[in-house]
Structures are given as C-alpha cells and as structure tokens.
C-alpha cells in the first residue's frame, strides 16, 4: 500500500434485521470500491443489521468469522473492509461491533465501548460493553484507529487510540437527526467533533453514517 491512502465511504440505508438483503447491498458497494481501486471501504455502524436490528438480535447475530463476512472480504480483493454487525461473543454476550477484513479474514475487531442510553438510544438494553481500544497496521505508513459512534463522544477513548499509534481515525456511526432530542444539532455536533480530533492529533479522520429513515429516526449520511 502506497503512502497515499484512498478511502471510500458506503453511506446507504440498511434493511432492518435482514442480513441477506444487507449482504447483497454490501457486495454491490464492494464491487464499486474495487473497481475504483479504493484501499479501504468503510460501512456505517451496524451496516449488516440496521439501526434497530437488535430487535431481532437472536436471528441476525453472527460471529466475526461468519462465512458470509469472509466471502465478502474475498470479493473485495486487496481492498480492506470495515463492516458493522451484531457480534455473537463468548458467554451469550452480544456486541455492537465493527470488523476489519482483508483477503478473506478478519484482521481486527472493535466492540463498541460507550453504549448510549439517552434520548431515543437504548443500546445498553441489547449489547454488552466492549472493553478495549487498540489500533491495527493497514500498511507501512498507516495504522487504523477504529471507534464506533458514541465512542467518539468520550475523548479519553479517542486519545487512547492515538496513544496506540493511530494515523487514521475511522468512525462508523448510525446517527439520526432526532436521536438526542430537540435543541441539539447532531450533524453540526459531529462535524465539530471530527474536525477537532483531526486538528488536535494531526491525522485524517473518516466518519461514515447511514442514510434515510428508520422507524422514528432520520439518518443524515451521504
């Protein structure tokens, strides 16, 4: 991988609780990114589940090495994928997770740590809390720091990612305009947050949100 990194963002409307339809959508984005010779393709938070996919949690959860995920990675060739899904972990624990895939295997997995339980967000009802922040080398010049949505609203987690050597901050999110409540501008808040981190740490950041309506939320990605 060259010093210049080409990162693509797949911002689309996931199907709630329908992994088959979402995998089909993912394969279409992968084909487009591969044709464009993108080095990295980032999908939104919970891209294979939908924002409210946890309502069908037991039907749609998957392990990090699910054959469908590995097949998606193989279809991407040399393009690195960051994919969001509900992970089935040990001891009947389920996580809001994002996996990094290359060459048909999972090379890194992040489990969301800062689970929101305010406004219209009730993630603590469904998911176990992640515990670790780390980074992963994706080339000679690049080290990927991966945090999911509300993780970025805890500055300590972002700082820890850069202490671990991140040179690129990747942030899949699932952010609806109405998620927090009236009086808070979610898109503007995210823009300020990502600009701040890039300025403070001198590193590029990539935020990827979904689009379209889902139940009582309107997503503003794209």
Residue ranges and their predicted role:
Residues 112-126:
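A short, polar/charged loop-to-alpha-helix boundary motif
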Residues 64-83, 153-222:
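CN hydrolase (nitrilase-like) catalytic-core segments centered on the catalytic cysteine
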Residues 25-40, 66-78:
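A short, N-terminal amphipathic alpha-helix
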Residues 83-85, 96-100, 134, 208, ...:
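Short beta-strand scaffold segments in enzyme catalytic cores
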Residues 7, 22, 30-60, 82, ...:
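Active-site beta-strand/loop signature of hydrolases that rely on acidic residues for catalysis
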Residues 4-16, 97, 109, 135, ...:
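Active-site-proximal beta-strand elements of phosphoester/diester hydrolases
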């Amino acid at each position: 991988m060259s010093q210049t990194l080409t990162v693509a963002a797949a911002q689309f409307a996931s199907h709630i609780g329908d992994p088959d339809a979402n995998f089909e959508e993912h394969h279409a984005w992968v084909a487009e990114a591969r044709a464009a010779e993108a080095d990295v393709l980032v999908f939104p938070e919970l891209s294979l589940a939908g924002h409210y996919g946890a309502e069908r949690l037991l039907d749609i959860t998957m392990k990090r090495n699910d054959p469908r995920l590995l097949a998606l990675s193989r279809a991407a060739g040399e393009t690195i994928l960051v994919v969001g899904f509900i992970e089935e972990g040990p001891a009947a624990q389920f996580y809001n997770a994002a996996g990094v895939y290359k060459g048909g295997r999972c090379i890194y997995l992040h489990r969301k740590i800062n689970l929101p339980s305010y406004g219209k967000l009730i993630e603590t009802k469904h998911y176990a809390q992640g515990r670790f922040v780390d980074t992963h080398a994706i080339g000679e010049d690049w080290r990927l720091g991966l945090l999911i949505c509300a993780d970025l609203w805890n500055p300590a987690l972002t700082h820890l990612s850069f202490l671990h050597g991140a040179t690129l901050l990747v942030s899949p999110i699932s952010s609806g305009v109405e998620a927090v409540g009236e009086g808070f501008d979610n898109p503007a808040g995210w823009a300020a947050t990502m600009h701040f981190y890039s300025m403070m740490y001198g590193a590029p950041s990539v935020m990827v949100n979904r689009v379209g309506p889902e139940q009582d939320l309107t997503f503003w990605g794209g």
